[in-house]
Amino acid sequence: MSLEKTTRMNYLFDFYQSLLTSKQKSYMSLYYLDDFSLGEIAEEYEVSRQAVYDNIKRTEAMLEQYEEKLLLLKKFQERKEMFNKLKELASGSKEEEEITALIEALEKLD
């Protein structure tokens, strides 16, 4: 599994986990956050490895569908990029400290 996919799934899970069932949350958390193998999760829940795999794949697809509709990750990434550009523009300005403080305050709200 690629690092990009893992990172994306972690972000999607953070944004949309409240929309998942407790079993989906648990499987995704164990697989992506705790780095459990499919076999370890299957053993923990006394189900087949295939059942865990199917559940994780369905949940990944659901998370992608939520993102297609709600765009929380996309908007988060765009805001992050804008903050970085603002910081670049602020450096060297005579009001740099004040601008930087405002940017940091905005980031804390996010």
Swiss-Prot record:
InterPro entries: RNA_pol_sigma_r3/r4-like, UPF0122, UPF0122_fam_protein, WH-like_DNA-bd_sf. Transmembrane segments: none annotated. It comes from the Bacteria. SUPFAM superfamilies: Sigma3 and sigma4 domains of RNA polymerase sigma factors. Pfam families: UPF0122. Belongs to the UPF0122 family. Might take part in the signal recognition particle (SRP) pathway. This is inferred from the conservation of its genetic proximity to ftsY/ffh. May be a regulatory protein. This is UPF0122 protein YlxM. It comes from Bacillus subtilis (strain 168). The gene is ylxM.
